Structure formats: C-alpha cells, structure tokens
Swiss-Prot record:
Gene3D superfamilies: Hexapeptide repeat proteins, Spore Coat Polysaccharide Biosynthesis Protein SpsA, Chain A
EC number: 2.7.7.23, 2.3.1.157
Protein name, per record: Bifunctional protein GlmU
Cytoplasm listed as a keyword: yes
Major location category of this protein: cytoplasm
Species this chain originates from: Bacillus licheniformis (strain ATCC 14580 / DSM 13 / JCM 2505 / CCUG 7422 / NBRC 12200 / NCIMB 9375 / NCTC 10341 / NRRL NRS-1264 / Gibson 46)
Subunit structure: Homotrimer.
Subcellular location: Cytoplasm
EC top class, as a word: transferase
Record-stated family: In the N-terminal section; belongs to the N-acetylglucosamine-1-phosphate uridyltransferase family.
Length: 456
C-alpha cells in the first residue's frame, strides 16, 4: 500500500460564526470540529498528518497537541495556497494525500477509506469526494461525460441552467497523488475576482494534462456538511448526536428518548444500561452494564459502575462504584470516589471525598474533604465543616461509625471505628472508636413558660 498523508485545512477565520472563538474550535457534541476531523483521519494509517493553521493557530495547536504536525498560513489566500504551506513537510514524499476541511466534523474514516480505495483502483492523480444534494444551490457541480467520468467541476455561479440541474456536488474533500499535487499547485493562478488560489484549479490543470480525475460518491450527504455559521453548527450537532445515540443503541444501550439525550463521542456505555430523557453525558464518561441514568442527570469525565442508579443528579470528575444509588438532586463534585453499594441521597453534596463500600448519606448533607470508611451512616443534615475561611481541612470517619442527624464535624477531626455521634452535636475533637460523643447543650424544660410567650 502506498504511503498515506493528510492535510487538514483549518486556517479560515470563520467570520460568519460571529464569535470570538476560532471557527474550527467550536464544539460538536462537546468536541471541537477540527478534532473530530483529525481523529477520523488518524484512523487511515497515515504516515503524516499536517493541519494548516492561521487565525487562532496557537489555540488549535493546544487543542490537538501531538495528534498533528502544523503549517502556518499567515495570509488566507485560498485553499490551494493553504495546501501549499504543507510543502516543506510533504513536498518530497511519494504516496497519496487526502485533503480535508477542518469544518466538516461529520466526515467518517469509513468514507475516507472508501475514497482512498477508489483512488487507488482508478490509478487516478486526483479523486473528488462527491455527494448528491437535494438542494445543491451554492455548491460546485460535478459534470460527467458520456462514460460517467468526471469532465469538470463547475461552480454554481458559473453553471448553465442545464448544469444547475445536476445534484451531484463537490464536497471539498480530495485525494491526490502527492507528487502531482505539489508540482501542479505551483501552476495555480490567482487570476480571479477574489485574487485567491483555489484547490479545484489543481484538478483542472491535471485534467487538461490528460491525467485521470476520478470521483467517489458518498451515499450520505449529511456527512459532508461544512459548518460556516451557527445554523450549520446546530445541524451538525443534531446529526452527530443521532449518530452517537444510534451507535449506543445498536450496542445494547436503551435510550428512552434519543432526541432528548446528549452523549459525548468519547463516552463508553455498557449493555442493558438505560438512559432516560434529559440526560447529558459530557467528556470521557464510562458507564458499566445494567445501570440506570436519568432523568435530567449530568455526568462529566467520570466513571460509573454496573447496576448503579442515578436520578436527577450531577457527577463531575469522579468515580462511582457498582450497585450505588445516587439522588435525586445529589451533586458529586470533582475528585470524589464512591465505593460499591453506597447510598448518596437527595440534596447531598460530596466534594473531594471518598466513600467506602455500603456507606450512606441519605439526606441533606454536605461532605467535603472527607474520608468515609465502610458501613458508615451519615444522618440527615450531617455536615463536614471543612473550611475556616482560609484553609481546607480533612474529616476522617472510620468503618462502622454512626453520625446522628444535624451533626457538625469541625475539621480536622477523626471519628473512630464504630463510634456514635449523637444527633445535634458539634464535634470539634476526635472521637475514640466505640465511644458515644454528645456535644450539645443539655435540654431544659420550663413548666408553663409557654403561657408567658403567648401573652406577649
């Protein structure tokens, strides 16, 4: 197999987005457009991948990191000029180069692989990725001869009435013989209204030289969508969400309402897990089998074990074990680790804390900077007082301890193994194992005193 290379065009400013954010960094299902493109291209067994950057170059490099090499297009003078910037990296190579726009996040590796196969089969100097559009207005048309070969590409504004009836369009993705590409690109002129150097001119030059120009038609027009404004961005979001959700359902995950379920492209979900409407799964989330998530829950960069049930809750940058129940209305904040068979109930907030197996905080608690052992019960309204206004301190509750309702544990403090803290206590000192700690004022009953209050 010939060596393969890729050039991703990502230098345009994207003024139609009307945004401070560089166009190709706008996310689709939580992942920047250009990263979708690069990740799919990297599946093609490439020798080198070069991203052409311009506006926002440093931001793009920071996002993609070592996934790509980079070439700078300091002035945006057209697509051929952009590809030419990769000559110092690819110009001396032999093989096939695929050129992809960085604003086509829906393009798949499978389609690109099929295009490369067609390119090799036809022994072409260039192969154009085409699609059939129901409304081809604005697209360049693929005009074929009587043999079905590509005769020319005609831009919409230059097309005759007959040519405008053609629905096969140029998607802007190409395969080139690498040597032919970088030799011919030097011949491209900017003699046009915009004064720019256009990549389709390379195709025209090769065609005029008698070289083979092929086309591969994808059956999925949606895949070729270029995102140039917020309307197209929303369309790409819808198509990508449908693709992701379909993949999970085909892999054995039940989505009760796919149209109202948002799953990141990086998520991994086990079989027989059920996702209810309004669920948002962002970033690198891994969910085990037979879990139940929803409704209206948000998971971000976290792991969730098998058979765990999460209801109307938020989990961020944390680990949750097997057979856990969370919610409704719980918040698991970053750097928390929840063991197996744990119960985190309604209106419980956990921050940077670890819960051992079978421990419970069932109602109305704040647990921050804490290490909770196994089989611990935190009663309703239990609070770890972890902050003195300047510093955070740690609370440790050992195995089998019982914390009564409405208790305040003022850190740093340790509750020993099997200890009991009486309801309503404010604990400021360590409690030994097996001890009962009572830290509240003694109750005083004043007989008939209520009458004096009622008379006021």
């Amino acid at each position: 197999m010939d060596k393969r290379f890729a050039v991703v065009l990502a230098a345009g400013q994207g003024t139609r987005m009307k945004s401070k954010l560089y166009k190709v960094l706008h996310p689709v299902c939580g992942k920047p457009m250009v990263e979708h493109v690069v990740d799919e291209a990297r599946k093609l067994s490439l020798e080198k991948l070069v991203t052409i950057v311009g506006h926002g170059a440093e931001d793009v490099k920071k996002q993609l990191g070592e996934k790509s090499e980079y070439a700078l297009q300091a002035e945006q003078l057209g697509t051929a000029h952009a590809v030419k910037q990769a000559k110092s990296i690819l110009g001396s190579e032999k093989g096939t180069t695929i050129v992809i726009c960085g604003d086509t996040p829906l393009l798949t590796a499978e389609t690109m692989e099929a295009m490369l196969t067609e390119h090799q089969k036809k022994a072409a100097k260039v192969t154009i990725l085409t699609a059939v559009a129901e409304d081809p207005t604005g697209y360049g048309r693929i005009i074929r001869n009587e043999n079905g070969d590509v005769a020319k590409i005609v831009e919409h504004k230059d097309a005759t009435e007959e040519e405008r009836l053609v629905k096969e369009i140029n998607t802007g993705t190409y395969c080139f013989d690498n040597e032919a590409l970088f030799q011919t690109i030097e011949q491209v002129s900017n003699d046009n209204v915009q004064g720019e150097y256009y990549l389709p001119d390379v195709i025209e030059i090769l065609k005029n030289q008698g070289e083979t120009v092929a086309a591969y038609q994808t059956v999925n027009f949606q895949e070729t969508l270029g995102v140039n404004d917020r309307v197209a961005l929303s369309q790409a979001e819808i198509y990508m969400k449908q693709r992701i959700n379909k993949r999970h359902m085909q892999n054995g995950v039940s989505l009760i309402d796919p149209d109202n379920t948002y799953i990141s492209p990086e998520a991994v979900i086990g079989r027989d897990t059920v996702i209810y409407p309004g669920t948002v799964i962002k970033g690198r989330v891994v969910i085990g089998e037979d879990a139940v998530i929803g409704q209206n829950s948000e998971l971000e960069n976290s792991t969730v074990g098998s058979r765990t049930v999460i209801k109307q809750s938020v989990i961020v940058d944390s680990e949750v074990g097997d057979d856990v129940t969370i919610g409704p209305f719980a918040h698991i904040r970053p750097d928390s680790k929840i063991g197996n068979e744990v119960r985190i109930g309604n209106f419980v907030e956990v921050k940077k804390s670890e819960f051992g197996d079978r421990s419970k905080a069932s109602h109305l608690s704040y647990i921050g900077d804490a290490e909770i052992g196994t089989d611990v019960n935190l009663g309703c309204g239990s609070i770890t007082v972890n902050y003195d206004g300047k510093h955070k301190f740690k609370t440790k509750i050992e195995n089998g301890a019982f914390i009564g309702c409405n208790s305040n544990l003022v850190a740093p403090v340790t509750i020993g193994e099997g200890a009991y803290v009486a309801a309503g206590s404010t604990i400021t000192d360590d409690v030994p194992g097996r001890a009962l700690s009572i830290a509240r004022a003694r109750q005083v009953n004043k007989e008939d005193y209520a009458e004096n209050i009622h008379k006021k």
